[in-house]
Amino acid sequence: MIRRINLSGNPNLGVYISVTDSVALIPQNTPEKFEGVLREALEVEVLKVSISGSSLNGALAVGNSNGFVVSNQAMDREIDALAAAGVEAVRIPERFTAVGNLVLANDNGAVASPLLSDDALQVIGDVLEVDVKVSTLAGLNIVGSMGAATNRGALLNPQASSEEIGIIEDTLGVEADVGTVNHGVTLIGACSVANSNGVLVGEETTGPELARIEEALGFLEG
């Protein structure tokens, strides 16, 4: 299911929400209406949490069905709250805290920014239980902000090179396409939230953009 919605007037959904096929980490002050739409569209358990005392869960965490890697500034109580809900979360040993902006992942693999250290790459691979490859996307280091990936497909920044697209397809084990959201915005990961069940995008996303998103993320099959 694909839905157009803003979070308290903000279309940058991927900055605030980190999602897998089973769980969504959303800000503690998320309105009930938005929470209901997310729960229905993505078919997930919703956890209202903070990371590093912040509402920027999408920027500060990346996960798949095996767990989440979070900012090294995440607090013990936040890690414990996730553990109590049955969600493993491990801090990344890295000075760059916005791990959600730097990693594109699904249950098959992870593509990580060249900015990340070998130790960070090891933790990502161990926690998510996937192979990790290093690449830019659209020539930029913020791989997670430049794309959205699920176990069904990936939507990438239109400036992605054929080499970058090939790396992402090989690593994540899905077909990828390029497109935009929110009427021409190329920061796909920062402006959308997607899993294998559905996708949320900002209210300004156009009809042609929706069609491309549905196709790229595998919602037009069969």
Curated annotation (Swiss-Prot):
Pfam families: eIF-6. It comes from the Archaea. Binds to the 50S ribosomal subunit and prevents its association with the 30S ribosomal subunit to form the 70S initiation complex. SUPFAM superfamilies: Pentein. One of its GO terms (biological process) is cytosolic ribosome assembly. Belongs to the eIF-6 family. One of its GO terms (molecular function) is ribosome binding. The gene is eif6. Transmembrane segments: none annotated. Keywords: Initiation factor, Protein biosynthesis. This is Translation initiation factor 6.
